[in-house]
UniProtKB/Swiss-Prot annotation:
Membrane-crossing segments per the record: none
Reaction equation(s) it catalyzes: 3-dehydroquinate = 3-dehydroshikimate + H2O
Species per Swiss-Prot/TrEMBL record: Methanosarcina acetivorans (strain ATCC 35395 / DSM 2834 / JCM 12185 / C2A)
Entry protein name: 3-dehydroquinate dehydratase
Domain of life: Archaea
Length: 242
């Protein structure tokens, strides 16, 4: 069984609201709009201190009752972390050891093996869910490359393997969905996203093919990645497609 906090991803896909500003205020708003999980983006919030991050996560969980996924995205993968790579991953390690800390962590496949393994080890030691991710903002790799990337994530001990790609055509989108379905049929837990305008519909359609997480914005004018839709709209459409 794959869970983030108490949310069972084998029963249904989760709508993840991305918290990128005014963390407590937007988290409450996301909960009101129907979010299942909150992703706290430390890099976008400009949080570099473990104590500050822990306090915010604690308050968010207390106020909303929702599970929290913590992410501290590197610049290379579309994030805004400024500073040493070791400090970026050590911040995640520190938070994962807390009893009332995050329920899950997202670490990039592109992180150094040493730093990535420290984050994964800390998460596993404290019963937290591990998402290993890869983001390509320029293209959609071939089906073989996407399959190999997801497989590498599972070898690295991902609970959830996540890829986000930029399609140049609807064929690219179909290839991503086909790869998603293939992993679902082998019992693997994946999250797949096609970004930008051609991939916008995958935000609500990919779960039908086996993607267990779909990322959404709280406001339509504040998105963390191209093509994100508002939480309440995603929830509504997903309910209609059930």
């Amino acid at each position: 069984m794959t869970q983030i906090g108490p949310f069972d991803l084998e029963k249904k896909a989760a709508v993840v609201a991305v918290i990128l500003e005014k963390p407590l205020e937007t988290s409450k708003k996301a909960a009101e709009k129907g979010a299942d999980i909150l992703e706290v983006r430390l890099d976008l919030l400009g949080i570099r201190n473990p104590e500050s991050a822990a306090k915010i996560i604690r308050e968010i969980k207390s106020e909303t009752g929702l599970p929290v996924l913590v992410t501290n995205r590197s610049v290379a993968e579309g994030g805004k972390w400024e500073g040493k790579e070791v400090d970026r991953t050590e911040l995640l390690v520190a938070l994962l050891s807390l009893k009332d800390g995050p329920d899950a962590v997202d670490i990039e496949l592109s992180a150094s093996r040493e730093d990535r393994d420290k984050v994964i080890k800390a998460a596993k030691a404290h019963g937290k869910t591990v998402i290993i991710s890869s983001h390509d903002f320029s293209k959609t790799p071939s089906p073989q490359e996407m399959t190999a990337t997801l497989a590498e994530m599972f070898l690295a001990e991902a609970d959830i393997a996540k890829i986000a790609v930029m399609p140049g055509s609807m064929e690219d989108v179909l290839n991503l969905l086909k790869v998603t379905l293939e992993f679902k049929n082998t019992g693997k837990t994946v999250c797949t996203i096609a970004m930008g305008k051609p991939g916008k519909h995958t935000r609500v359609v990919a779960p039908l093919y086996g993607s267990v997480l779909t990322y959404a914005s709280i406001e339509s004018n504040a998105v963390a990645a191209p093509g994100q839709l508002p939480v309440d709209e995603v929830k509504k459409i997903m309910e209609m497609l059930k």
